[in-house]
C-alpha cells in the first residue's frame, strides 16, 4: 500500500518475490504477480505447501486508517510467480480479532497459526487446524498448549526440515524482545515440546522472528537488531551453522582381556539428530 501504517510510520506492506541466480546472488525483488494479492492493507508472513502450489498469507485490513486485526488468505498458483485471486481462510468458530502467521505442512492439510482466540494463555498463542477434504473445511482450532504457548506473545511459526517447530516468543526467558525457539517434534503426532532458545548470534537484544530453514544448516530470519546504518528496522539475515569439527581418539579392547587392543576395529559415532561418523 501507499499509505502510512500509524503503528510503524512506514508504508503498508506488500508481498514481493526475489529470485536467486546461478551464482547464488539475489536478483532485485518484484511485486508478486496476482490479482487481489497486494492491496492497500498490510500483506505479509507467507507460507507455501510442499509443492509451492498453494500460498497462505496474512492480511491486516484497515478502514479509515484504523487497523482491524489480521486474517489469513489463500491463493492457488497459476504458473511461475503468478497467483490466482485469494480467498479468506474461514475458521470455525472464529471469535478473534487477529489470525495470522500461517505455517503449513508439506501436504497443505495441517496449519499452525498465531491468534488471540479465546481459551489461550495470553497475548498471541499458536493454534492448529486440519483441513477435512470431505467437508471442504478446516477443523476447530486447537491450542498447542502451555509447553509452547506463554502469557506473552507466541507467533511466527515455521517447520524445520525434520518436523521440529521454530517460533518466536517474548514469554520465555531470552536475550531480548521476541526470541526464536526450536521445539522438538514428538513422534508421528502433531505435537511439540521442550522448546529451546536458539541463542546468540541468531537472537539479539531486539526482536528476532520468522526463521525459515533453507537446508538443515542454513536459513534466513528477520531481526530488528541495529543495522550498519544504525537503525533498528526489520531486516532479513542469513545464518549458517558451521560443520562439527572435533578430534576423537578411541582405543578398542577385548571385553574379556582389557589390555588386549583390537586393531582395525570399526567405530560408529551417532549424534542426537541421527547423523553418523565412521572410522
Predicted features and spans:
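Short, conserved micro-motifs composed of acidic
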Residues: 1-251, 255-261, 266-268, 275-278
Amino acid at each position: 500500500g501507499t499509505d502510512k501504517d500509524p503503528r510503524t510510520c512506514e508504508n503498508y506492506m506488500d508481498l514481493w518475490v526475489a529470485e536467486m541466480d546461478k551464482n547464488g546472488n539475489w536478483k532485485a525483488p518484484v511485486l508478486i504477480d496476482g490479482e487481489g494479492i497486494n492491496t492497500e492493507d498490510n500483506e505479509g508472513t507467507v507460507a507455501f505447501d510442499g509443492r509451492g502450489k498453494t500460498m497462505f498469507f496474512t492480511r491486516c485490513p484497515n478502514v479509515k486508517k484504523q487497523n482491524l486485526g489480521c486474517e489469513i488468505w489463500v491463493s492457488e498458483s497459476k504458473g511461475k510467480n503468478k497467483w490466482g485471486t485469494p480467498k479468506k481462510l474461514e475458521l470455525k468458530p472464529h471469535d478473534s480479532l487477529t489470525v495470522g502467521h500461517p505455517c503449513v505442512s508439506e501436504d497443505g492439510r495441517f496449519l499452525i497459526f498465531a491468534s488471540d482466540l479465546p481459551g489461550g494463555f495470553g497475548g498471541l498463542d499458536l493454534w492448529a487446524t486440519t483441513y477435512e477434504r470431505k467437508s471442504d473445511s478446516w477443523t476447530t482450532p486447537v491450542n498447542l498448549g502451555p509447553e509452547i504457548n506463554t502469557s506473552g506473545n507466541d507467533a511466527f511459526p515455521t517447520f524445520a526440515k525434520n518436523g521440529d517447530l521454530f517460533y518466536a516468543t517474548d514469554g520465555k526467558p531470552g536475550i531480548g524482545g521476541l526470541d526464536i525457539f526450536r521445539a522438538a517434534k514428538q513422534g508421528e503426532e502433531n505435537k511439540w515440546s521442550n522448546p529451546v532458545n536458539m541463542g546468540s548470534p541468531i537472537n539479539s537484544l531486539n526482536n528476532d522472528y520468522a526463521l525459515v530453514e533453507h537446508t538443515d544448516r542454513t536459513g534466513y530470519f528477520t531481526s530488528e537488531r541495529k543495522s550498519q546504518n544504525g537503525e533498528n528496522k526489520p531486516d532479513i539475515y542469513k545464518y549458517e551453522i558451521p560443520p562439527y569439527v572435533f578430534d576423537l581418539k578411541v582405543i578398542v579392547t577385548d571385553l574379556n582381556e582389557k589390555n588386549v587392543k583390537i586393531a582395525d576395529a570399526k567405530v560408529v559415532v551417532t549424534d542426537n539428530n541421527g547423523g553418523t561418523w565412521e572410522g
